[in-house]
Structures are given as structure tokens and as C-alpha cells.
Amino acid sequence: MYQLFRHGIFQMDAEKAHNFTIQCLKLAGNPLFKPILKSIIHAPKGFPKMVMGVNFPNPIGLAAGADKNGDAIDGFGALGFGFLELGTVTPVAQDGNAKPRQFRLIEAEGIINRNGFNNNGIDYLIENVKNARYKGVIGINIGKNKFTPLEQGKDDYIFCLNKAYNYAGYITVNISSPNTPDLRQLQYGDYFDDLLRSIKDRQTILANQYNKYVPIAVKIAPDLTESELVQIADTLVRHKMDGVIATNTTISRDTVMGMKNAEQQGGLSGKPLQHKSTEIIKRLHQELKGQIPIIGSGGIDGLQNAQEKIEAGAELLQVYSGLIYHGPKLVKELVKNIK
């Protein structure tokens, strides 16, 4: 059935297809239709897992970028995910970069996007989270607005952290999207140190205010040198971050040279990212020595490479592009088999 649906949406522009899918899942998540979706999917229960102090119903999650505004929480939840990471969301709504900004690399099962954190703002997302019936874990991925100067970037993260804290199972700090100018600079040196210090200080205040501890993860890029990766791992440990997501999209085109749309600017996700993200997970695991859990993301399209990420050191996994190319059966297969 999904192959038929895929054939239809692949006739559309990639972003229009995405928006159409979100609307379909929003409708399917409606209490009137959700039982029908669940009866079609037959999602297995999966294996519960405690990570970052949070009890996940199963270790398979939806990666950020799929449901930026939390419009289809219950629809995605019905597919069997143990957790959903919503966003990236910013303090105020923004349109993102000029269209077209999403491109399929069909022969490689990849996607290039240069969206630029298009979203309806943190308040809109929080309202959707409040209204959702989904029983799994909700992560909220936060970023900075495009026109906020880098020097004031931490203020945007703190603003979103304040808003999201009471409604999130965990929060992700996204400093690794290649589509917001200079954002990746926040991964390095004094910027990184200052940002993490400010976030941890605010987390302590919020934990006392709400009488609960909400873990905070950092999402990193795959395009890191060895010394950069070592430095990032050291900084994460020093600031006692609760988790790290490896990885975001890549700016490399090594695996897709010459293919249609490969020349488009933006972050490349999907199968071409598979090996690179697994290697980053492996090296990160060696550096972190089990002190901080890793959430693996990047190119998961089947059980074998999902298992490779677990063996490399990931404790939880996230999918997005693989869902576009392979449909809900991918989620079902992973939930059924990954522990």
C-alpha cells in the first residue's frame, strides 16, 4: 500500500509532498480515524529502554525535521514510535530559506534540504504538545532564529528552553544544521562552552521550579575533524550533558557525486549519510566511554544498519528519510527487533 502512496507523492515537489503527508497524518491521528490507522499498522510494542533517566516505550524515534510544529503528533505516534522529536523550533515563527529548498536524490535514497528552520514558533508547538494524546516520549528540538546574532544565540536557546521544559520528555539543542548561517560555529570553542554552561545553569533553575529533571541532549554534525570530535566530546562530558544525537545532515557530497540534485546546497540526509553517521557514533562512543548516552540518527533504512548503529554505541535510534523511502513498515521492523 505504501508503494502506491509513495508513487503518488513522488510526483509532487518534495516539500509539497512533505506537507501533504503531515496533513494526512494529522487527519489519521484524529480520534475518529486513529483506530483505523492502528489496525492497518499493527505496531508491535517493542522493548522499553531507560535512557537519560527517561523510560522510552521502545528505542525507535522520529528524528527532528519531520514534524517541525507538532501538527501530526498522534498520527506519527500511531506508527509505533517510542518517541517523537519535534522541531526544530525557534523563539518566533520564521519562513526559512527561499523555495524550492527540498530535493530528492531518488537513486541514492537521499534528500537534500536547505529549509533554514522554517517553523511556526515555540508557542504554537507547545499548544500542539498540550493537546496531543500520544503516550510515548516527546522530545523538543530547539534552535535560534536566523536574524539573531551569533553572540546572542544562547538567548534564543534559553528562551525556548524556558517554554519547552515543562512539556518535554527531553530537549535537544540543535547547533548543527548547515542551513542557518554560522550556526555550526556554536559547536566550537568559547561559543560552545558558554552555550552549554548557560543551558545547564538554566536547567538547574527549571528543575527546581517544576520539581522535575528534564534531560538535555546536543545534536552534532557529521562533518567533524578528529580533533573537533574529541573537543566536542570533552566539552559535553565537562558540562555533564545528558545525551548527544549523532548526527545531523552532511554538507559532503562524496557518496552522491554526479547524481541528479547532488549539486543543490543544503544538508544531505538518508542512505548517503548512513556510514558517516555510524562512524561518528563509533568514535564518539570511544571518547565518551559510556558517560553520556548516544542517540543514533542518519541513514537508517533497515534492520542491518540500525543494528550497526547500536553496535557502534547508540542506545536509541531516530529515522526520518528512511520513512519517506520505505514507509511505516520500516518503523514496525525496527520496533519489533531493536532492543
Swiss-Prot record:
How many cofactors are bound and how?
Binds 1 FMN per subunit.
| Binding, substrate | 68, 113-117, 174, 179, 248-249
- Superkingdom, taxonomy of origin: Bacteria
* Cofactor(s) required, per the database record: FMN
Record-listed FMN binding positions = 64-68, 88, 141, 174, 219, 247, 270, 299, 320-321
Q: What is its main location?
A: membrane
Q: Where is the active site?
A: 177
- Enzyme class, spelled out: oxidoreductase
Q: Name one GO molecular function term.
A: dihydroorotate dehydrogenase (quinone) activity
List locations, semicolon-separated. Answer: Cell membrane
UniProt keyword list? Cell membrane, Flavoprotein, FMN, Membrane, Oxidoreductase, Pyrimidine biosynthesis
**Membrane topology type, per the record?**
Peripheral membrane protein
Q: GO cellular component terms?
A: cytoplasm; plasma membrane
**What Pfam families does UniProt report for this protein, alphabetically?**
DHO_dh
Question: According to its UniProt record, in which pathway does this protein act?
Answer: Pyrimidine metabolism; UMP biosynthesis via de novo pathway; orotate from (S)-dihydroorotate (quinone route): step 1/1
User: PROSITE patterns attached here?
Assistant: DHODEHASE_1, DHODEHASE_2
Enzyme Commission code: 1.3.5.2
Q: What does this protein do?
A: Catalyzes the conversion of dihydroorotate to orotate with quinone as electron acceptor.
Subunit and interaction comment: Monomer.
Q: Which family does it belong to?
A: Belongs to the dihydroorotate dehydrogenase family. Type 2 subfamily.
User: What name appears for this protein in its UniProt entry?
Assistant: Dihydroorotate dehydrogenase (quinone)
Protein species of origin: Haemophilus influenzae (strain PittEE)
Gene name of the record: pyrD
